[in-house]
Structure formats: structure tokens, C-alpha cells
Amino acid sequence: MKASEGIQNYKAKVKECVNYCVKEIKYVCKEVGGRESGSPAERKAQEHMADELRKYTDSVEFEEFDLHPKAFMGWVIIVGICMIASVILYNLGFALVSLILTLVGAVCMIAEFLMYKEFLDPFFPKRTSANVIAIRKPEGEVKRRIIFNGHCDSAYEWRYTYLGGGHLLVAVIAIAIVGLVVTLVCEIAALATGHAMTAFDGGFWKIMGYVQLIWIPSYISILFFTHWKLVVPGANDNLTGCVNAMAVMKYLSDNGIRFENTEVRAVLTGSEEAGLRGAKAYAKKHHDECLETETIFIGYDTMRDYDDMAIYSRDMTGTVKNDIRVCNLMKKAGEHAGLDLPFKSVFFGSSDAA
């Protein structure tokens, strides 16, 4: 049965939930502001959300974990420094050292950004963050579980997104990556032709050394990619996700709904912007629990306009495939609400769903 068929004054109650979401977003933005991963501000927002969830659920717990919040975006600075040095050293005749630095930059980028590994974490200061876990028990024993998720922290400002939106962001990153590939090819050619530690006297590869200098401004620009002193309010990314998960619990409670054998959870993760650290901590701690009981995870992130709303069937820059059964379930839910939600891929970055 659809909720619209079984709940009296359905539209009014949905509107009430929408108003609740807007009120909660405004409250956190005004009273807390930006919420750096693992910061007191992140915890303050979570404490408020936990207090709200206690009204609608049977239990609310905090699960703490350690993280290194600046490690995730630290790869950008490392790549910039390594590539500036690589280009200079190549032109001075130290192609082997240049190659090593290029590979260091490439490995940091792949491990941290494409694979979201905790690769650079030991080199950065440690903090403590937490996940908020609210549970609404079913009627009868737990045979199934559905988790609604949003992340509580907000990101450091990305300067080029602020200045030119997604197009400038992609251009800045793409130009730097092209430069890295060009330098890598030149370094391999130098080693293959016996110029590992000697400069080219002339010819094509000598000219390519000068061509690489064109990318120096690009590498300098990515050093300023992240505004480390400015944490954005994160009303869209991702208070919208948090309050959607909270609104599910409120709606169920307000209407006296308990599913038979299906437990409902709201998991409000910390430190997503630091490389999905909260989601990773939850998945690690609850791994066996999720395998023993059929579990569905629905991650809400940046719920804005209907025109931009989608079901993301691929994540982590397209490298992770989300379960198509859950995607189809969300597709059906959208149809019940009169929305034809397309399947899309997270083309740059990732979400807790990954």
C-alpha cells in the first residue's frame, strides 16, 4: 500500500515534514555554521540531531572513530609540489628523480581520491569524529533492515568551484592531470634512451622539456584548490541528507508506523568530506551485522531541485557500482511520488553509499 492511500491528510503531513526539514537546516546553519570534519561544530550539530531523533526512535547512540581530516584533500597539494619539482628536474637532466616524484603524486591521487584509501592519514593530525545511529524497532524480530543516511559535516571551500562552478573545477583538475601524463611519458622516454641522470642535448625530448613548463601555472593553481580556513555552511551538502533521514523517522513516529520485521535506522555519519571516513567506520564495525540480516542502505546527498535529482547507480568517480535492486526500488519510490528519476554516475568524487 502506498503511504498516500493509507495515511489520512497525507499531503498535509508530507508538507509538515518538508517544513520540518527546512526549519532544521536553518537552525543548524544559524546556530552551528560550518562543520569541519571531526570538529566541535560537527559534534554540536550531531548532538542537536540526536536530540531530535530521540523524539521519534527507540534508541540513539554515538559511535566514535579516529580520522585525519586534512589527509583526504592533502593529495592535491602533494601532486602540485611533486609536479613542479618533476618538470624542473626533468629539464635539469634528472629524469629518474623526476619520474619518482611524478609517481609519488600519481599514487597519492589514485589512492586518496579514486580509491578513497587512508593512504596519507599517518602524515596528518588526528581527530575524533562520530556517527549518530538512531533505531526504530519493528514489530516482531528483525529480519530486514533499511538505513537512511546523510552526513553531518561540511566541506572546506573549493576555490575554483566557488569562482567558476563545476566547469572551472573540472578544467583545473583535467589540465593538471594531462600535464602529469605528458611529464610521465617524457620521463619514461628519457630512461628508455639512456638519459636517466643526464640532460638531452637537443631533439624532440629536449623540446618536450620546455613544453612541460607550460603546466607550471596549472600546478601552482592547484596548490590553492582548497580554502583550508573556510568551511562552508553545507545547507545542501549535506544537511539536506541528514534532515531527510530524520524526517523519515518523524513521519513514521507521527503516524504510528512500525514495519513488520523491518528495522529502520537513521545513520548520520561524520566526516564524509574527509574521504567517507564515517561511512567506512560504520561499515567496518557493522560488517557482520549487515551480512547476517538483509540490509538496504540509502544515502541522501545534496537534495536540491527536482531537475537535478537522480538515483546514482555508480559512485566513486564511476568506479563503484551500486546495487541495481536498491536503485530500482528508489526508482519505483520516485514514480509513486510522481517523479521520473534518472540513473546517473557520480562523475567526480564519491558519497557514503560507495
Task: Specify the residue positions occupied by each region the protein language model found.
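Extracytoplasmic/secreted proteins, especially bacterial periplasmic and envelope-associated proteins
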Residues: Y20-K23, Y27, K44, H48, ...
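Generic structural signal for residues in well-ordered beta-strands
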Residues: V60-F62, A266, L341-F343
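Histidine-centered divalent metal-coordination motifs
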Residues: H151
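Acidic/histidine-rich catalytic neighborhood of metal-dependent amide-processing enzymes
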Residues: T102-I133, E141, S154-R159, A189-K321, ...
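Zn-dependent metallopeptidase/amidohydrolase metal-coordination segment
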Residues: K26, P342-A354
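A non-catalytic alpha/beta surface segment that caps or lines the substrate-entry region
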Residues: G34-K137, R159-K206
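Proline/glycine-enriched tight loop/beta-turn segments at coil->beta junctions
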Residues: P138-R145
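N-terminal hydrophobic or amphipathic helices/low-complexity stretches enriched
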Residues: M1-A41, E47-V60, A71-W75, R136-K137, ...
